[in-house]
Amino acid sequence: MPFTATVLTMFPEAFPGPLGVSMIGTAWKEQDLWRLETLDIRAFSKDKRGFLDDTPAGGGAGAVLKADVIASALDSLERDGRPLLYMSARGRPLTQARVREWSKAPGIVVLCGRFEGVDQRVLDARGFEEVSVGDAVLAGGEAAAMVVIEACVRLAPGVLGNIESTLEESFEDGLLEHPQYTRPRTFEELDIPEVLLSGDHKKIDQWRKRMREETTRERRPDLWEAHLANQQAKGDPKPGKPKET
């Protein structure tokens, strides 16, 4: 059974979006290497008027998606051991390590919130993991769900042409990726670094490692500190400051 992503949403028409194009889309539509399902939670309203939400307990602005509606939608599915994810700005940050963990499951079930969010009781009762794709607030969880789904399915066997490329990306070993270049050799008076044209693969690997360390230290000090701690725990020497090339 291919990796299956099921999305609980008020707006199933938002999908597949970018999931339907390029290699990800081909793997879904033509190769059946992964599957996408959407479930319209509006179909599970218990209100004669079709309402899915109610006012927040304790007062306040906005509306909250009702627990019984979400529970009914979820209970209509066969989970098959798939993790339950709720897209939320207050959730734990999305990381490549978590993506790799989820990608090993039969699939994922993703709940997209709206308004002020979802009644906390259904999240607790059903064991949802709250996931954030960044420190910003969106109108709903659909765009964030697509990010999580794409991150997972691109790791499914056969989806990408070269699986080794996923091992050299940002975050795979705690560091950000090195800069990339291609022809032409000179662009607006900027040249490709000479080491990349040297044919000396040892020097190229050393340069790329230095650039990864430099980029991580400058742009993500949190990742850099975690990387240093991990290296020290392994007994590896502390990386030095990357040299200019």
From Swiss-Prot:
<keyword id="KW-0819">tRNA processing</keyword>
<dbReference type="InterPro" id="IPR029028">
    <property type="entry name" value="Alpha/beta_knot_MTases"/>
</dbReference>
<dbReference type="GO" id="GO:0002939">
    <property type="term" value="P:tRNA N1-guanine methylation"/>
</dbReference>
<dbReference type="Pfam" id="PF01746">
    <property type="entry name" value="tRNA_m1G_MT"/>
</dbReference>
<feature type="compositionally biased region" description="Basic and acidic residues">
    <location>
        <begin position="210"/>
        <end position="225"/>
    </location>
</feature>
<dbReference type="GO" id="GO:0005829">
    <property type="term" value="C:cytosol"/>
</dbReference>
<feature type="region of interest" description="Disordered">
    <location>
        <begin position="210"/>
        <end position="245"/>
    </location>
</feature>
<comment type="similarity">
    <text>Belongs to the RNA methyltransferase TrmD family.</text>
</comment>
<comment type="subunit">
    <text>Homodimer.</text>
</comment>
<keyword id="KW-0489">Methyltransferase</keyword>
<dbReference type="InterPro" id="IPR016009">
    <property type="entry name" value="tRNA_MeTrfase_TRMD/TRM10"/>
</dbReference>
<comment type="function">
    <text>Specifically methylates guanosine-37 in various tRNAs.</text>
</comment>
<keyword id="KW-0949">S-adenosyl-L-methionine</keyword>
<dbReference type="GO" id="GO:0052906">
    <property type="term" value="F:tRNA (guanine(37)-N1)-methyltransferase activity"/>
</dbReference>
<protein>
    <recommendedName>
        <fullName>tRNA (guanine-N(1)-)-methyltransferase</fullName>
        <ecNumber>2.1.1.228</ecNumber>
    </recommendedName>
</protein>
<keyword id="KW-0808">Transferase</keyword>
<keyword id="KW-0963">Cytoplasm</keyword>
<dbReference type="InterPro" id="IPR002649">
    <property type="entry name" value="tRNA_m1G_MeTrfase_TrmD"/>
</dbReference>
<dbReference type="InterPro" id="IPR029026">
    <property type="entry name" value="tRNA_m1G_MTases_N"/>
</dbReference>
<feature type="compositionally biased region" description="Basic and acidic residues">
    <location>
        <begin position="235"/>
        <end position="245"/>
    </location>
</feature>
<dbReference type="InterPro" id="IPR023148">
    <property type="entry name" value="tRNA_m1G_MeTrfase_C_sf"/>
</dbReference>
<feature type="binding site">
    <location>
        <position position="113"/>
    </location>
    <ligand>
        <name>S-adenosyl-L-methionine</name>
    </ligand>
</feature>
